Amino acid sequence: MKKVISTLMIVFAVTVFTGCQRNYTVYERHDITACGVKDPLVNVKWLADKCEEIKKGKAKEATISLLKDTVTQDNAFMIRYHYKQRGKDMYSGDGYDCSGKWLYGFRSGMMPFPPEEKEKFFKNKIGLGVIFKFSFK
């Protein structure tokens, strides 16, 4: 009986410690220049901090897209999150300028922000692609 209990305890311990490990994938694009610096994922401090925050967070998936204003040539970032809340898929996003100033956002299940905020943020901007993606398998 002691052997059975010991075996069960070992199996339980192994299950607990290996079952808590989360499998994830990370895509980072370091071969770009934006906001006046090479590799903004590393060299723009607030963006580097945001990437680390995303890796430690609970979002099922997060992407950072690089945008460029076709008139001013300024860059901006759109960070989108996909997560579960009470069993439902939820989405949110935040738009930032190069300094890390929040300019626009949206949230699933909440009152939408005024449409003019979205229009103002995306006006004259083109997407240059995803530069960071984090997702759980």
Model-predicted segments: where are they?
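Post-signal peptide N-terminal segment of mature Sec-exported envelope proteins
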Residues: R29-V42
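Positively charged n-region of N-terminal signal peptides that target proteins for export
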Residues: M1-V4
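Mature extracytoplasmic domains of secretory-pathway proteins
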Residues: W46-K101
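Bacterial signal peptide processing site
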Residues: Q21-N23
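Long, leucine- and charge-enriched amphipathic alpha-helices
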Residues: Y27-H30, Y104-S108
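C-terminal motif of bacterial Sec signal peptides marking the signal peptidase cleavage site
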Residues: V16-G19
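C-terminal partner/receptor-binding element of secreted or periplasmic proteins
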Residues: G105-K137
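Repetitive helical segments and hydrophobic/amphipathic motifs
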Residues: V11-F12
